[in-house]
Amino acid sequence: SFAKTLDEIDADRIGVWGISYSGGHAICVAGLDTRVKFALSVVPVVDGFPTMRRCHGERKFAAIQKLILDDREARQRGEPSQMIAMATTDPDNEISSWPFPHVCTIFQDIKEREAPNHIHENTLESVELLMQYDVMPYAKRLYETPYMMAIAKGDNITSSDLEIDVFNAVPCPNKKLAIVEGVDHMSLYSNNEHLEKVSSAQATWLRDLLFGPDALLAQAAE
């Protein structure tokens, strides 16, 4: 609704594009709002419960579930939700939302280089909400909304098999899946060459969608 009020926005060609958690949100927004004319996701979070279960493993997952239940009771007593690290360099001994050391080091590097206000922690309530997150019902609503998903081959953070299941559930025939080799979930945040592999594939699809497949040839001829 806000985007349509902006002079620089073509209200007939509004789309959504997101990476990781916001990649899942792009599916949800497109499924909820028919004014969205296309959607693109990069390594999206698609189903929080199995994602967390896989990431933490059975024993760690049981421990974080216990923390979540304790946190519910604390919030009922009027206490704030407990803060935990988003990721740590020692996930075997320290609880975190995403138990991968390289997630911590990459985001700390981003904080030092370009995002000084980044705080590398979140509430347990946020983890609880993540475990309730499932984009599948919204993916099934994309009957006429063109959609593209780009995933990292073998992604062990957001689980490429879960992502492919969601892609296959999108009923719109105008959809494309790009499985990109030689990149991983976090390298898209830290390696511009890896990001370029994904963004170029999506940019090509988007250009063809909005301007037609001959757009590049016409541009080269000018």
For each predicted feature, which ranges?
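Gly/Ala-rich beta-loop-alpha elbow adjacent to hydrolase catalytic centers
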Residues: 18-22, 26
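Active-site nucleophile elbow and catalytic-triad environment of alpha/beta-hydrolase enzymes
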Residues: 55, 121-139
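Conserved alpha/beta-hydrolase "acid-adjacent" motif
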Residues: 131, 156-162
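Short beta-strand/loop motif that positions the catalytic acidic residue
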Residues: 142-143, 149-151, 155
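Catalytic histidine-centered segment of alpha/beta-hydrolase-like enzymes
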Residues: 183-196
